Each structure stands twice: as C-alpha cells, then as structure tokens.
C-alpha cells in the first residue's frame, strides 16, 4: 500500500477502522445466517482494507513520535488499531465457516 493513497489523519483512520469493524462483524454473522458466499467475499475485502488502514496508522504514528516519551504516549493508538484489526480477523474466521 502506498501511503500517498491515504490522506487521512490518524483519528480519521481509527474512526474508519471502528466503522469497518462494526460492519465486518455484521457481515460475518449475516454470511452464516444466509449461507452467503457473496457476503464472505465482502468480509474478505474489508479485511484487506483493514490491513491497509492498520499499516497506515502504524507508519503515521511512528513518524509522529520524536521522543521516547511521545512514543510511549502514542503506543495506545497502535493498540487501538491492533484491536480493530483483531475484530476484523475474527469476523473473517467466522465467515470462513461458510467455505
């Protein structure tokens, strides 16, 4: 992924990740309920998007930290991004039950 493609702030990226994590859980559940392979594909697409967003957050946070103290303060942001990514991966695991 090219970071030039993502011109959002870290806050905007985290908000996007939160929104996508909500959608992906709903899609994964619906894919099971309706036995829908189309929904499984949408889950996979969102998973890929979440990976890109997580990467963008990591790079932006690393670039923002100038001192050890700032790095410690920014580590929480990385934990939030990782948590959203875990939600997406777990939803992907649920959707894989269809395959």
Where are these regions (language model features)?
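Cytosolic, long alpha-helical scaffolding segments
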Residues: 1-99
